[in-house]
């Protein structure tokens, strides 16, 4: 469970790290080379973040990084938001270190459903027997928000305990899409500057939720993680009030 220890760094920066993690699905995976012992091996990957902050991967057994992790499960995932206007060295980046493990059999169906929801092109790989789902058990997190904004984050905040609302996710999503579409419209307008009366909620996380607008996905962030159904409702009600001026 997230402790959000105040001595690490300010909440604003922690939220920026989480928002970066939630707002992209591409990264560099580093594994320990099986062929060239002692050397790290970098690969481009796509990933999906789960309801909690678990990182999910879908990869082939014949991929070099998969061969590596079967010998040594230690891995590092680096993601970034490139600053193309100014100094690229001032770009935000997040490094997640841990061990890559098979997704448990009981969780495979749900994992596949979520993965295809975010990366529909991955569905074609499901017919190939050598593709499998993995999750990164995160043990170390390094955040760099720019010059002078550097910290090791508390790994306790990135454990894979499921929130209490997890089993109610579909019901909550259907309710928002059917009865509170205006809240989704105003949130998308407020946080991303996009006006779309046909926006729909597609997935929940402890840090916010995802909406789909014109074939693109957008992350709507919260100010703090939410674990209980009643608290999720409170945050959505608060957003509705805060973003009333953004209604279409």
Name every feature range the model reports, one short phrase each.
Residues 26, 42-46, 95-97, 133-135:
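Conserved hydrophobic/aromatic beta-strand scaffold that supports enzyme active sites
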Residues 30-34, 48-50, 80, 144, ...:
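A generic structural motif
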